[in-house]
Amino acid sequence: MATFPLYCQGNYEIQVYGADTVVPGRTMVELHSNFTFEGFKTIDQGVLPDNHQLHETVEITQGWTKWFETGFYIFTSYGPNQGYKWVGDHIRPRVRVPDSWHWPVGVSVSTEIGYQRPIFSADTWTWEIRPIVDKQWKSWYVAFNPALERSFHGPSVPLGVTFSPNFKFAYSVTRKLSAGLEYYGSLGPVTGFDPLSQQEQQIIPSLDYDFGPNWEFNFGVGVGATRSTDHLLVKMIIGRRFRFITPRVPRVLKPNSGGGGE
């Protein structure tokens, strides 16, 4: 999700993507729950602080083909004396390299565009393109998301395209449990990165547990490494795959095997 740390509440969807897409006919429903224990405490550019805020995002992803899916996000925020508030929505189509190409790594590309209310993000309309590369090797897993982001309305428009790399490596401790480390950065414009103190640098030790082929679970505790980053947060992702749509199978007309006619 596109984030510009000086002017918006982030932490709505904290995830390093793998290259796989949702299979055709399946719908993935995920709940992202992120609580900031120690974050920003003052209003900046009209944006509410995120300290002690619970950000919850519903992500619905539909698989259409073996290489194409579409995701839709509904962002919400809950804070002391504020109650639940709608933050905004994003849409995210994604394509991937089919398995039949036999590439040595998984590769996909997503693009995401959407709106967030001004009290949650001074940059209300944003866009992102995210290349995704991953690899499973025995018990080890690695994923890299070198995302490029752009604001279309708000104070970050003059910055142009910014660079936000995400990275994850994990090790399968058991057949069900893997432990890993996730990194999330927002480094500034591609034409010249911000000073380190103004960059967003967050490191999240995380756990993934396999409850079954239709489930997804991720939990992590994030620590900010710079003053422009929330200092302490907890994130959790719970996902479930459903079959709401049955893919149409083309009919194959068999040749007439009868030997006679009139």
Regions found by a protein language model. Give the residues of each.
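N-terminal signal peptide c-region/cleavage motif recognized by signal peptidases
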Residues: T3-P5
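Transmembrane beta-barrel domains of Gram-negative outer membranes and organellar outer membranes
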Residues: Y7-E262
